[in-house]
Amino acid sequence: MFGKVFVSYIRTRIGFKPLSTIYTPVSSSSLSFDKEACFPFKKWHELNMSQKQEFIQRFVKNYRHQYPSSKTNVSLKGLSIGMDEHNDSPSVFGIFYNDIWKSFKNEQLGTNNDNMKSGSRFSHPSFKQLLIQK
């Protein structure tokens, strides 16, 4: 799991002194890739335009249902208007999607992330149902 990366020397008053060998994961990207490979939901950048627009429409509807008196509803609705005409998807919804994705992934893996506490706006299970499967 860990491999030697390098041995370094530090200059001291008397001369050079070897530092401890620094250990890092052999391939940290491949370890996280394996965990993501078995996760059944796509990331935002993997979605095509119609899937993004579908998520946005469902997200706006769900957010309005969960937080009916929130002023954010007006902004979300305004951002989502005209997506079909312009063949566009506002990137702010990608941030929301990835936050939900990370929250659900951490929950599935049993890791506790300080950024995704149970009190976050997207912690309600209905938001996790909005994720698009692979």
From Swiss-Prot:
GO cellular component assignments: mitochondrion
Note: Present with 172 molecules/cell in log phase SD medium.
Protein name according to UniProt: Uncharacterized protein YMR252C
